[in-house]
Curated annotation (Swiss-Prot):
Component of the PAT complex, composed of WDR83OS/Asterix and CCDC47. The PAT complex is part of the multi-pass translocon (MPT) complex, composed of three subcomplexes, the GEL complex (composed of RAB5IF/OPTI and TMCO1), the BOS complex (composed of NCLN/Nicalin, NOMO1 and TMEM147) and the PAT complex (composed of WDR83OS/Asterix and CCDC47). The MPT complex associates with the SEC61 complex. Interacts with VCP, HSPA5, DERL1, DERL2 and SELENOS. Pfam families: CCDC47 (PF07946). This is PAT complex subunit CCDC47. Residues 21-135 are cytoplasmic. In the embryo, expressed in the endodermal layer of the yolk sac and in the small intestine. It is a single-pass type I membrane protein. Residues 157-483 are lumenal. Residues 1-20 form the signal peptide. One of its GO terms (cellular component) is multi-pass translocon complex. It comes from Mus musculus (Mouse). PANTHER family: ADIPOCYTE-SPECIFIC PROTEIN 4-RELATED, PAT COMPLEX SUBUNIT CCDC47. One of its GO terms (biological process) is post-embryonic development. It is found in: Endoplasmic reticulum membrane; Rough endoplasmic reticulum membrane. Residues 60-104 have a biased composition (Acidic residues).
Amino acid sequence: MKAFYAFCVVLLVFGSVSEAKFDDFEDEEDIVEYDDNDFAEFEDVMEDSVTESPQRVISTEDDEDEATVELEGQDESQEGDFEDADTQEGDTESEPYDDEEFEGYEDKPDTSSNKNKDPITIVDVPAHLQNSWESYYLEILMVTGLLAYIMNYIIGKNKNSRLAQAWFNSHRELLESNFTLVGDDGTNKEATSTGKLNQENEHIYNLWCSGRVCCEGMLIQLRFLKRQDLLNVLARMMRPVSDQVQIKVTMNDEDMDTYVFAVGTRKALLRLQKEMQDLSEFCSDKPKSGAKYGLPDSLAILSEMGEVTEGMMDTKMVHFLTHYADKIESVHFSDQFSGPKIMQEEGQPLKLPDTKRTLLFTFNVPGSGNTYPKDMESLLPLMNMVIYSIDKAKKFRLNREGKQKADKNRARVEENFLKLTHVQRQEAAQSRREEKKRAEKERIMNEEDPEKQRRLEEAALRREQKKLEKKQMKMKQIKVKAM
């Protein structure tokens, strides 16, 4: 019995201890729930607050069941906290909102929906289109055109060079027999014969000859077509043009008389009459036919006087003109040659241009652009015509009446020129006088000595008074003569 009572006492003691422990567990659970409910008012309780569960270290195996119960109670309390937070969020969503607080909010466009309305479409480009030659047709055309231009430049330049050399080879013997110096390039101080053409550019070649009686010199200019220019080649297909040889002979003043004369195609003479200063002033009439002298219909004559035409159109000259009429563009003899008309922006020039006694020949190379080196030999008789014309101009002289008429024509041209430029010359003289007065005043003002400055002013004043007195005397003399 004592053992039984003792066993009952132990049971009671053990029960009281376990009951006390259970009460402590419930109190701690209430504390945890109280703390969680306090922080459940915030919506971001899961992000900001970190709940820490009370942990107990139970060393005995008998307390494992109690620890399990404690953890289960803690999980239930956390679930309760989440449910409270959800209910609070639901309450805030169900609450009515104030329209004035969100004024203008609905007016904002929803850009996110508009961006998603038009989807981006990607087109698949076939790979064979990118690698095809058709994609580079523009580059191919440009390269082809560039190669064609370069090839044409080389071929055209070489052809002009061959034509020039062929002309020089066929005329060299004749030129060296009539001139001491052939081919001076002007680079040396002393005249030296180089015996070759001087290339000005790809289509113009020059040759200077001198050392002959009755002339200062002769300049030969071979004006070939611009065969090196592809555009010029294409333009010539629609309008053929011929190569030309231009020869300019400068005569001595004492070896040529005073006259102006020209013969050539009617079209060329009309152009020269319009462009050249001497032909427009001394040969104002229209070109006349040369049938009277046996010239073909393709050639016409411009002459200052009939005596000049009669003297120049001898048998040999007519022979040259008739047999080589297809190669002759123009022949121009003038003692008043000054080149093309001078056009100035501010009106007429104040003085007559300088003149030279000149013989000017322009010949067309046969072939109308399709010229070959062998065609240059056909121009040799025309060079003989030039040599003959030099001697003819030296021998020809006007009679006394013709000389007087020529002098009157030149005086008339000079008088007309002075009338046209009278106003301009007066303005130029007035500007020179004003400039002189201005310089005199500046010299007086820059004088530092007052006494010397006063004397200079008095001298200038006396000069002005003398000029006024001279003008008054001239006016009185004019009035007396008028009476």
